[in-house]
């Protein structure tokens, strides 16, 4: 047993998990359950009453958090301590949205001042582009921006831009490219005019394979349309810490925005990586996005555990994963603009907490990061919700919905809300055999057939969910929501005693991918690797099966 599983608070939860009544009973015996098990902060309302939890459960979960020194770990992150111990780095994405008068020192430098300088530079750049002052090589204004990145430098900007579609200023179109598949960039470039297109290349090293390959292809396309190397500076900018490589490529040093080691890619949308967002929604709205996230930072850092929204959500996820063997967690967004959030939270959580050793290198003997997946309501109700209701696996769910729509057409939004709330009720309540049979009594079916169908219509219920509401989707509430999930991810990693801020599995994939690439482009037959890899490489070289 590891240190964590030996804790009395952990073992108390193990024992307690076997004695909880069905949620139906909890609701029937606790008339004030909704009021007692809901909270609000930072423009968000969280109903966590539809969880397998009593007041005793909550006390035991908070005891585990306290025994795991969660509060001191939260303070250590905000203070800039080196909590990413494998890479010897501070973890300070929170500094990206801190107010200008805040002082956070890393290696003797106030990084908040650096962040503010970068935000000012971003503002000037956004203004020059959206006002039409920035001209392309033929004197035309820029109409289209192509953002090239991968991982956090792609997914965050894309999903946030999509979510904030109602706030686009309309001056620019933005296109996102990540996959190294040539089809991706080829399709994006179709219909674009090189005279009015600007590329934003995001790579800390300016050498990430997929990003560099796509950027080189974009440059070849640009030059093939009649532009010259000297024109590159008017159509390419970079977010990178490798200034020399970027300038060698042809990018003006003044148009290179910084990245810092104390920000991981999946936490970087708040930095200059978010430049495409700012270009679409304007700098004022981008600052509102940061302000919403900062408000959640303050809540997380200063609120007691018992009413701390990220702590509550993180502890529930751990509760189901470690004590009920839940292997996945579903995120269901009842707002079309938020349809990309499940994929964003998937990267955030799975890249952070997909770990199997503790900070000190001990193998864990408990489950860590679950599979995060999901989609858009109500589409999922006609697909995978069936598994949620009657499948054998326990899959906790998060339902996310604004109370007011940006597009209040007819009865659409009230129907959307009825589906959202109805699903949470059905998951909690289920349907007993007697209830199913009673519904069939007027069907005219033979008794034997009624008994059979009733068995198939039984739903166990007791399926947990959280419901997160906001008045309306705005830059501020979106910032709060994303920061909520960032900190929820931190809470789980802190309890599990793992490093949520490295990604050695990703790094190994890059390394082996480069090794395979060398063999794919070599003239000789591949023989050095395992028989499967050799066989696949040689089939690719043949170009046929």
From Swiss-Prot:
Biological-process GO terms, alphabetical: gluconeogenesis; glucose 6-phosphate metabolic process; glycolytic process
Pfam families: PGI
Intracellular or extracellular location(s): Cytoplasm
EC id: 5.3.1.9
Top EC class for this record: isomerase
Catalytic reaction equation(s): alpha-D-glucose 6-phosphate = beta-D-fructose 6-phosphate
Biochemical pathway: Carbohydrate biosynthesis; gluconeogenesis; Carbohydrate degradation; glycolysis; D-glyceraldehyde 3-phosphate and glycerone phosphate from D-glucose: step 2/4
Active site per the UniProt annotation: 351 (proton donor), 382, 510
Reported function: Catalyzes the reversible isomerization of glucose-6-phosphate to fructose-6-phosphate.
Protein's name according to its UniProt entry: Glucose-6-phosphate isomerase
Lineage per the UniProt record: Bacteria, Pseudomonadati, Pseudomonadota, Gammaproteobacteria, Alteromonadales
């Amino acid at each position: 047993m590891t240190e964590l599983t030996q804790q009395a608070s952990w073992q108390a939860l193990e024992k307690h998990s076997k004695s909880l009544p069905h949620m139906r009973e909890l609701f029937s015996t606790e008339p004030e359950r909704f009021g007692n098990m809901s909270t609000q902060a930072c423009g968000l309302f969280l109903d966590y009453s539809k969880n397998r939890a009593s007041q005793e459960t909550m006390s035991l979960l908070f005891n585990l958090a306290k025994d795991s020194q969660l509060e001191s770990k939260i303070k250590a992150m905000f203070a800039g301590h080196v909590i990413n111990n494998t890479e010897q780095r501070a973890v300070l994405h929170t500094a990206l949205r801190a107010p200008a008068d805040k002082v956070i020192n890393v290696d003797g430098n106030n990084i908040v001042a650096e962040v503010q300088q970068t935000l000012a530079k971003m503002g000037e750049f956004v203004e020059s582009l959206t006002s039409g002052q920035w001209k392309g090589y033929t004197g035309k204004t820029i109409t289209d921006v192509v953002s090239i990145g991968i991982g956090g430098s792609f997914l965050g900007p894309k999903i946030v831009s999509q979510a904030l579609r109602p706030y686009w200023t309309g001056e620019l179109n933005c296109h996102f490219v990540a996959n190294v598949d040539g089809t991706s960039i080829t399709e994006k470039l179709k219909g674009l005019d090189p005279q009015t297109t600007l590329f934003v290349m995001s790579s800390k090293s300016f050498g990430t394979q997929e990003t560099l390959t796509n950027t080189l292809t974009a440059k070849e396309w640009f030059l093939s349309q009649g532009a010259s190397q000297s024109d590159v500076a008017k159509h390419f900018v970079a977010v990178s810490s490798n200034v020399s490589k970027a300038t060698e490529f042809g990018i003006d040093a003044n148009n290179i925005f910084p990245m810092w080691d104390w920000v991981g890619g999946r936490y970087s949308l708040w930095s200059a990586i978010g430049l495409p967002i700012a270009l679409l929604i304007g700098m004022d709205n981008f600052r509102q996005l940061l302000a919403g996230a900062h408000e959640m930072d303050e809540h997380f850092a200063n609120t007691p555990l018992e009413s701390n929204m990220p702590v509550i959500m993180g502890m529930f996820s751990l509760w189901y994963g470690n004590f009920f063997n839940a292997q996945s967690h579903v995120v269901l967004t009842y707002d079309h603009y938020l349809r990309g959030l499940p994929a964003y939270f998937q990267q955030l959580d799975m890249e952070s907490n997909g770990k199997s050793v503790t900070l000190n290198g001990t193998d864990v003997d408990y489950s860590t990061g679950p599979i995060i997946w999901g989609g858009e309501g109500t589409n999922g109700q006609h697909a995978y919700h069936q598994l949620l209701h009657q499948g054998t696996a326990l899959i906790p769910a998060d339902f996310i919905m604004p109370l007011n729509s940006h597009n209040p057409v007819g009865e659409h939004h009230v129907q959307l809300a009825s589906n959202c709330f109805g699903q949470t009720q059905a998951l909690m309540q289920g349907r007993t055999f007697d209830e199913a049979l009673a519904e069939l009594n007027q069907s005219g079916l033979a008794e034997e057939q009624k008994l059979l169908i009733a068995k198939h219509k039984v739903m166990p219920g007791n399926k947990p969910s959280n419901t997160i509401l906001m008045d309306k989707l705005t830059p501020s509430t979106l910032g709060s929501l994303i920061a909520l999930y960032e900190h929820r991810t931190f809470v789980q990693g802190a309890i599990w005693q793992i490093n949520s801020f490295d990604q050695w599995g990703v790094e190994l994939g890059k390394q082996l991918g480069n090794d395979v690439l060398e063999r794919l482009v070599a003239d000789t037959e591949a023989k050095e690797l395992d028989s499967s890899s050799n066989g696949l490489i040689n089939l690719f070289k043949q170009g046929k099966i």
